[in-house]
Amino acid sequence: MVKLKNIKKNHDLISCDFFPEDAQNPGHIEYNIANDEVINCDYPEGYEWCDSHLSHAVDYLSSVANDDKMPESKLIMWY
């Protein structure tokens, strides 16, 4: 599970805070829409192993990249 909060789109950049699993403090993602790549990712301390969580978050950001309106938050769950 990963929670995305403060999702913001500014031209070709989407940024958000992300909380993998039970993290109390957020990490931060910056995703470049034009290049389809993460240009910055800061994991929350102690959650540096959460590459899978980052991948799910980026997949979601990519899927909404061309939407006119961004949600402010999103909960992503998988099994």
Model segments located where?
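N-terminal acidic leader/helix
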Residues: V2-A34
